[in-house]
A protein has these predicted regions:
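An acidic, low-aromatic, low-complexity terminal/linker signal
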Residues: 1-176
Length: 176
């Protein structure tokens, strides 16, 4: 009987070890991976660990008395998700949505927010040594949300700090 208890504890211990190894492996496979997308002619990137899914543009229900860049809310399989238009957040002129327009559903600090982008490009690996600090500039709303500049071959991707994009004065996007 005592032998069975020891075996069970040993098996549970091994299972816990395997679960921890799987978590580490999952983190490693996402390390340095970024979802890239376009706003106008510029390429942007967000760390893949914050991305839940990408959906096509759909009906957005307006909510009164909110900031202009918050387009409203969507019902995603029973979950109500606030949606912001990244163009408007960056103070770029609004543009009519096309068949390439997507909503990137993100999650940070247990807050789920959809980001409307002109077009999703791909998932890229951008190693840390290929990411430079953001340029020192005080011009424009966009620079406030830049985490760095990623170099991919001859191209650059503007790395977005999702926390700063979603939080305005320490409040989540949907709070007043």
């Amino acid at each position: 009987m005592e032998e069975q208890i020891i075996e069970k504890d040993s098996v549970n211990s091994k299972l816990d070890e395997l679960k921890q190894l799987q978590l580490i492996e999952d983190e490693d496979t996402q390390k340095d991976k970024f979802l890239t997308f376009r706003i106008g002619n510029e390429d942007y990137a967000i760390d893949i660990k914050y991305i839940n899914e990408i959906i096509s543009i759909q009906k957005i229900t307006s909510v009164p008395n909110i900031k202009k860049y918050i387009k409203g809310i969507i019902n995603l399989r029973g979950n109500i998700i606030p949606v912001i238009d990244v163009r408007l957040r960056f103070h770029i002129d609004e543009k009519e949505y096309t068949d390439k327009t997507c909503i990137v559903v993100t999650s940070i600090n247990n807050v789920h927010v959809g980001l409307i982008v002109d077009e999703v490009s791909e998932v890229l690996s951008i190693p840390e040594d290929k990411i430079s600090p953001p340029p020192q500039t005080n011009k424009g709303a966009k620079s406030r949300y830049i985490q760095g500049i990623g170099r991919v071959g001859q191209k650059v991707k503007v790395m977005i700090n999702l926390f700063k994009l979603l939080y305005d004065e320490e409040k989540p996007v949907m709070e007043n």
